[in-house]
Design a protein with these regions (language model features):
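An exposed, glycine/acidic-rich loop-and-rim segment of catalytic or binding clefts
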Residues: 1-327
Length: 327
């Protein structure tokens, strides 16, 4: 079933609605019209006890602060980084918002920090839609992005994206939800056990911008081809990882066909027994462990805090900055 409530209001006075889908087993997902974002996701532990496995806030206005990490929000038109805040496409140069140093992060955030329309609802699904006019934030085409969330009886949360444009354009949407399967944001995710089906990663420079090269992660601190705790090597020195930040890297998924629908990663929390399997038809997944979040002070849900290394994002995507690195 699906239930609609009022989540709250933005400083502009705009109302943010919340839609909660619950299956017959009691699992549920709550989704907001701001950024078509995931606010809560209740899933059972090994004993059947339900808990909220995602980070977030009680006040919708907090979701619009980019320093708080795009919690649970849809990112578009182009997720991740664009070098130099510009790209060439079909013989023309397009300039995007320079919102992070000398480059663009998450297209400037407009898709994430604005209200979406509810296009359709069903017993166990909802479709959100947002229209982006031609050249908004520098991207070509009158562009509509839709995302459909479906919660199944098997406790699978499915996200399906659809893009429509009246001219050739670029698109790379993702969702920026952070998981903490312990349901206790006071605990870091360093004890979570992660597997990523990848043997290569996108090499980056000192600004974490892709160089266009693919590196071999076999035997390095980034090698999650066999499961091991996130915290086991997160602070080990490595050229692609910023000291003190930890993992914030694109893994190139090992698939016979880069667009095949296959399992990308598995996240397991030993104490609760909760296990998350992430599937995608995209070639990459950004593993980000919240290292850029403040170490204290960020409010969360209830008395919790959204702080340093309290959640892990597994962002399925085309490779970062592939607008400049087509190969």
């Amino acid at each position: 079933m699906i239930e609609k409530t009022v989540f709250g209001h933005l400083p502009s006075g705009e109302q943010v609605d919340l839609y909660t889908i619950t299956n017959s087993r009691g699992a549920s997902v709550s989704l907001q019209t701001l950024g078509a974002g995931i606010v809560r996701l209740y899933m059972p532990d090994r004993n059947g006890n339900l808990g909220d496995v995602v980070l977030g806030f009680d006040d919708p206005a907090l979701y619009t602060d980019p320093d708080l990490g795009y919690q649970g929000l849809v990112v578009g038109r182009w997720a991740n980084r664009i070098r130099g805040a510009a790209f060439d496409f079909q013989g023309q140069t397009y300039h995007t918002p320079m919102n992070q140093g000398q480059w663009t992060l998450h297209s400037g955030g407009r898709m994430s920090f604005h209200l979406w329309q509810v296009k359709d609802t069903a017993e166990n699904s909802i479709t959100f839609s947002r229209f982006s006019p031609d050249m908004e934030d520098g991207f070509p085409g009158n562009f509509t992005l839709q995302v459909t969330y479906t919660l199944t009886e098997e406790n699978t949360l499915r996200l399906a994206y659809r893009v429509d444009s009246d001219r050739d354009t670029v698109a790379n949407p993702t969702n920026h939800v952070y998981f903490n399967l312990s349901c206790n944001p006071a605990k870091t995710i360093e004890g979570h056990v992660l597997t990523v089906h990848a043997h290569r990663f996108t090499e980056t420079d000192d600004d974490q911008l892709p160089t266009g090269e693919l590196g071999d992660l076999t035997g390095t601190m980034m090698d999650f081809s066999a499961p091991h705790p996130i915290g086991e090597r997160i602070d080990a020195p490595f050229r692609a990882v910023i000291p003190g930040i930890g993992y914030d890297n694109n893994f190139c998924l090992t698939k016979a066909n880069p667009r095949a629908f296959a399992e990308a990663a598995v996240l397991w929390e030993p104490e609760s027994g909760r296990r998350l399997s992430v599937w995608t038809d995209l070639p990459g997944v950004q593993v980000y462990c919240g290292g850029w979040l403040k170490k204290d002070g960020n409010p969360g849900k209830g008395d919790s805090k959204v702080t340093y290394r309290r959640g892990v994002a597994l962002e399925t995507q085309f490779y970062p900055d592939s607008l400049h690195c087509p190969n």
